[in-house]
């Protein structure tokens, strides 16, 4: 791809979500390796932090005041940054806005018990960087079976996105 003819750049909901999913996939591998070699707990912590920071960036208005999540519509959109014109959300409901649903995984309680250094860093990050875990799935409230959910979207966002995804006038085919 080349530069935009008018300059500027696009913040991509789908591309950013794929990177969040990549971090979760790498986290899963690092946790598996850490079960055999505790040195990988540091690597796992780094991938978890990267995932959390990506999720934060997608859900919150940064220094430039831009968020990929549109609170009014209840959907993720790409955002076009145009010189001298500011930021323009590209309000087209497409698969681009559903890809954030792909970046999801769980942490099992048994795993956290086996990897105390990872759990300590996870708990420290949640306690000392609370803004980063805001507006994504709740990491500090254990769910069914004491699992912890890692997801870009929290329950409210999930329900709002599913309204579009399961609507025959939007995404769901009648066939």
Where are these predicted regions, by residue range?
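Acidic, mature catalytic/reactive cores of soluble proteins
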Residues: 1-175
């Amino acid at each position: 791809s080349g530069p935009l003819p008018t300059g500027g750049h696009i913040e991509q909901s789908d591309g950013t979500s794929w990177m969040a999913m990549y971090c979760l996939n790498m986290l899963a591998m690092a946790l598996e390796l850490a079960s055999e070699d505790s040195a990988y707990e540091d690597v796992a912590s780094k991938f978890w932090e990267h995932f959390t920071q990506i999720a934060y960036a997608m859900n919150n208005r940064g220094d430039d005041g831009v968020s990929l999540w549109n609170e009014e519509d209840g959907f993720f959109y790409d955002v076009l940054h145009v010189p001298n014109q500011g930021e323009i959300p590209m309000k087209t409901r497409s698969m681009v806005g559903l890809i954030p649903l792909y970046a999801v995984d769980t942490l099992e309680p048994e795993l956290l018990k086996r990897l105390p250094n990872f759990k300590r860093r996870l708990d420290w990050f949640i306690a000392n960087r609370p803004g980063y875990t805001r507006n994504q799935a709740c990491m500090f409230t254990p769910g069914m079976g004491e699992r912890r959910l890692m997801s870009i979207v929290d329950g409210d966002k999930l329900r709002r996105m599913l309204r579009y995804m399961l609507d025959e006038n939007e995404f769901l085919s009648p066939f």
